[in-house]
Regions:
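Short pre-active-site segment immediately N-terminal to the catalytic Zn-binding motif
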Residues: 238-255, 271-276
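Stable alpha-helical elements in mature extracytoplasmic
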Residues: 140-151, 249-253, 257, 261, ...
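A metal-dependent hydrolase signature that marks the N-terminal structural subdomain at the beginning
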Residues: 35-208
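Extracellular/periplasmic catalytic domains that process cell-envelope and extracellular macromolecules
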Residues: 224-229
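Secretory targeting and sorting signals
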Residues: 1-32
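Active-site metal-coordination segments of metallo-dependent hydrolases
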Residues: 270-283, 318-321, 325
Length: 381
């Protein structure tokens, strides 16, 4: 007699298997990370390890023009508090935030890693001993060269060793340059693979545009003598492209380099304010320089354009100064140049610092929130 029970059991087993397969097809398991996702995650870890391996004072005192919307690996100076009521951030910051908002989480992580990596390259490896090319197509090189030459002869500080270097996202495509960068703090055995991975990610994530996406280098910074790479000013291609897009191309290079060199003036005199005057002071010094007869001697219309550029990088976080405060600081500096009795006299840098520190309280609203003031000071360390 046939074993009907066994046949029935096998039929049920077959049916169960079919049902299980159908269920598996209907509710797929979580997809494994793609190769690109794995690459980006590994690169992010490599760059994090690189930053963690840097000397303790490598990034100390480095002043960035803006706080990038990309949450870059490394220290950030924005105060940990909400925005100032009634304040609207400057147009350049608004544009940068709009660019960042378009990124996917994967793209954001890739930008985070590569932006941090590119800053370390331009700070710790790049040198003005090799020809520097400013602008995505080199279009700003003559203006940048003229500006740094004028600044070195304008302010009475040691200037021969202040480098002006180009910050270019396309440098990320050079494995040799990235190997030099990773060598600053990554374990030697990991350097070669990390450098190769950086260039691979640069080209396998289309949003990066091979290093030409402005967010990668939408900034400038000034570094003091004791930091990684020594005294230097870095000027980002992405920043120059964005300033051009916003209509400030006529004054972009001179204003930004003048501002960043203003930080060198502060560094030279050990002036390290723990408030917004740390950025507004260089606005004032830069305004004085571009309006002065021995600087660029720009007319009133061009001076006004400079103050609007100052305003475009104003923020609303008790960090770098609001748009109105940045504009006022730049205008104050310009007025010092145009109203002095002898138009050819250059005020000593120490005197300019002292004069601005006396003016600074007039540019700020009354300090009604003492806890907030304390928080700003704490954030600046």
């Amino acid at each position: 007699m046939p074993d009907r029970t066994g046949l029935f059991g096998r039929t049920l087993a077959a049916a169960g298997t079919a049902a299980a397969l159908a269920l598996a097809m209907a509710v797929p398991a979580a997809a494994a990370p793609s190769t690109v996702e794995q690459d980006v995650a590994q690169l992010y870890q490599d760059v994090t390890d690189l930053y963690n391996g840097l000397p303790a004072d490598a990034l100390r005192g480095v002043d960035r023009l803006i706080e990038s919307p990309i949450p870059k690996i490394g220290p950030r100076s924005r105060a940990a508090q909400g925005p100032i009521p009634g304040c609207t951030e400057g147009s350049l910051l608004t544009y940068a935030n709009q660019l960042a908002a378009q990124l996917t989480p994967l793209e954001n992580q890739a930008f985070d890693a590569l932006s941090g990596l590119s800053q370390l390259y331009v700070q710790g490896v790049a040198s003005d001993k090799t020809p520097q090319v400013f602008g995505t197509d080199g279009q700003y090189t003559p203006r940048a060269t003229e500006t740094i030459d004028k600044l070195r002869g304008f302010w009475d500080i040691e200037s021969w060793n202040i480098q002006l270097v180009a910050w270019k996202g396309t440098d990320l495509g050079s494995q040799a340059k990235m190997a030099q960068t990773f060598s600053l703090g990554l374990a030697p055995a990991k350097v070669k693979d990390a450098a190769a991975l950086a260039t691979k990610v640069l080209y396998e994530v289309p949003a990066l545009q091979g290093g030409r996406h402005p967010l990668l280098t939408l900034n400038a910074f000034s570094a003091p003598a004791g930091s990684l790479g020594g005294k230097r000013v870095a000027l980002g291609d992405g920043l120059l492209d964005t300033v051009n897009l916003l209509g400030f191309d006529d004054v972009s290079v001179e204003s930004v380099v003048g501002h960043e060199y203003g930080h060198q003036v502060d560094f030279a005199h050990e002036n390290h304010p723990r408030n917004e005057s740390s950025e507004m002071g260089p606005d004032a010094y830069g305004g004085y320089f571009v309006a002065h007869a021995k600087g660029f001697a720009w007319n009133s219309r061009t001076q006004q354009e400079v103050t609007y550029l100052d305003a475009s990088i104003g923020d609303c976080f008790h960090s770098h100064g609001t748009p109105d405060q940045r504009k006022a600081a730049g205008a104050w500096g310009e007025k010092q140049a145009t109203s002095q009795g002898n138009p050819n006299r250059i005020v000593p840098s120490a005197t300019m610092i002292e004069k601005f520190q006396k003016e600074y309280p007039k540019l700020m609203p009354p300090a009604t929130d003492q806890p907030a003031v304390a928080a700003v000071a704490a954030a600046r360390g």
